[in-house]
UniProtKB/Swiss-Prot annotation:
<feature type="binding site">
    <location>
        <position position="90"/>
    </location>
    <ligand>
        <name>substrate</name>
    </ligand>
</feature>
<feature type="binding site">
    <location>
        <position position="172"/>
    </location>
    <ligand>
        <name>Zn(2+)</name>
    </ligand>
</feature>
<feature type="binding site">
    <location>
        <begin position="212"/>
        <end position="214"/>
    </location>
    <ligand>
        <name>NAD(+)</name>
    </ligand>
</feature>
<comment type="function">
    <text>NAD-dependent lysine deacetylase that specifically removes acetyl groups on target proteins. Also acts as a protein-lysine deacylase by mediating protein desuccinylation and de-2-hydroxyisobutyrylation. Modulates the activities of several proteins which are inactive in their acylated form.</text>
</comment>
<feature type="binding site">
    <location>
        <position position="153"/>
    </location>
    <ligand>
        <name>Zn(2+)</name>
    </ligand>
</feature>
<feature type="binding site">
    <location>
        <begin position="127"/>
        <end position="130"/>
    </location>
    <ligand>
        <name>NAD(+)</name>
    </ligand>
</feature>
<keyword id="KW-0963">Cytoplasm</keyword>
<feature type="domain" description="Deacetylase sirtuin-type">
    <location>
        <begin position="22"/>
        <end position="270"/>
    </location>
</feature>
<dbReference type="GO" id="GO:0036055">
    <property type="term" value="F:protein-succinyllysine desuccinylase activity"/>
</dbReference>
<dbReference type="InterPro" id="IPR050134">
    <property type="entry name" value="NAD-dep_sirtuin_deacylases"/>
</dbReference>
<dbReference type="InterPro" id="IPR026591">
    <property type="entry name" value="Sirtuin_cat_small_dom_sf"/>
</dbReference>
<dbReference type="GO" id="GO:0070403">
    <property type="term" value="F:NAD+ binding"/>
</dbReference>
<protein>
    <recommendedName>
        <fullName>NAD-dependent protein deacylase</fullName>
        <ecNumber>2.3.1.286</ecNumber>
    </recommendedName>
</protein>
<feature type="active site" description="Proton acceptor">
    <location>
        <position position="145"/>
    </location>
</feature>
<dbReference type="Pfam" id="PF02146">
    <property type="entry name" value="SIR2"/>
</dbReference>
<dbReference type="InterPro" id="IPR029035">
    <property type="entry name" value="DHS-like_NAD/FAD-binding_dom"/>
</dbReference>
<feature type="binding site">
    <location>
        <position position="93"/>
    </location>
    <ligand>
        <name>substrate</name>
    </ligand>
</feature>
Length: 278
């Protein structure tokens, strides 16, 4: 794989802006804060990165999610209409995620390695609701569509870790009046999480890398355009071209477990060589 990207040299003023942004999202390591020549990279991952780990994608060609209509199991209206059905659906997903044969693959580990080098200069955004990035070692992940192993109070919004089944009768006792707990998932018609931080990151990015995404679902499908507007070099790593592949500067196709480690390895090698030459 030959990476066709610009040299990893950056204007000091842009890194000052990066410093302000990073301090808003994550606690910064003082040693990392002193490193001003690392590129600022935004990575977006989708279902394609977890498919090789055994995570089934929800949406089938016929528009059904595990034999259910999307409207029935992935909308606020569906939850209000039949909370038992919705809870059963996500209970099954939760149990599947915790099966012993479900594990991070080489692509997840490669991104954890990238974070280990770039530190706060990497913002990892995922559309996935699994925890495979964290299990691979990534510590700073924005789950824009929520997390399967968490639930939240429908009254206060308090988020709780949750690994077992959840019934429609389960109540959160954080409020004056116990309220139902729902999956901590962004359903259709709801606002994705962390959007202010995401758009700020896209505005500051030197590189935007999209991995395993279809380009069908907005606002994530528009991130490549947004990052382009601010001068980022854009890269698509995917099994096949996405719906927005024409907007990317650079494209590599194949299994995520192969193309992602290869790309990141050469990316870090190239950046390391350029930094030594400064």
């Amino acid at each position: 794989m030959r990476i066709r990207h610009r040299l990893c040299r950056f204007r000091k003023s842009k890194h000052v802006r990066h410093q302000r942004f990073r301090s808003r999202i994550f606690h910064r390591d003082s040693a990392v804060a002193k490193e001003m020549k690392k590129p600022f990279v935004v990575v977006l991952t989708g279902a394609g990165i977890s498919a090789e780990s055994g995570i089934r994608t929800f949406r089938a060609d016929d528009g059904l999610w595990e034999d259910h209509r999307v409207e029935d199991v992935a909308t606020p209206e569906g939850y209000r209409r039949d909370p038992e059905l919705v809870q059963r659906f996500y209970n099954e997903r939760r149990r599947q995620l915790q099966q012993p044969d479900i594990a991070p693959n080489a692509a997840h580990f490669a991104l954890a390695d990238l974070e280990a080098v770039l530190g706060d200069n990497l913002v990892l955004i995922t559309q996935n609701i699994d925890n495979l990035h964290e299990r691979a070692g990534s510590k700073r992940v924005i789950h824009m569509h929520g997390e399967l192993l968490k639930v939240r109070c429908t009254q206060s919004g308090q988020v709780l870790d949750w690994q077992g089944d959840l019934s429609a009768d389960e109540r959160c006792h954080c409020c004056q009046f116990p309220s139902p707990l729902r999956p901590h998932i962004v359903w259709f018609g709801e606002m994705p999480m962390g959007m202010d931080d995401i758009y700020q990151a896209l505005a500051e990015a030197d590189f935007f890398i999209s991995i395993g995404t279809s380009g069908h679902v907005y606002p994530a499908a528009g991130f490549v355009h947004e990052s382009h507007l601010h001068g980022a070099h854009t890269v698509e790593l995917n099994l096949e071209p996405s719906q927005v592949e024409s907007q990317f500067d650079e494209k590599h196709y194949g299994l995520a477990s192969k193309v992602v480690p290869e790309y990141i390895r050469e990316f870090l090698t190239t950046c390391g060589e350029n930094r030594q030459g400064d």
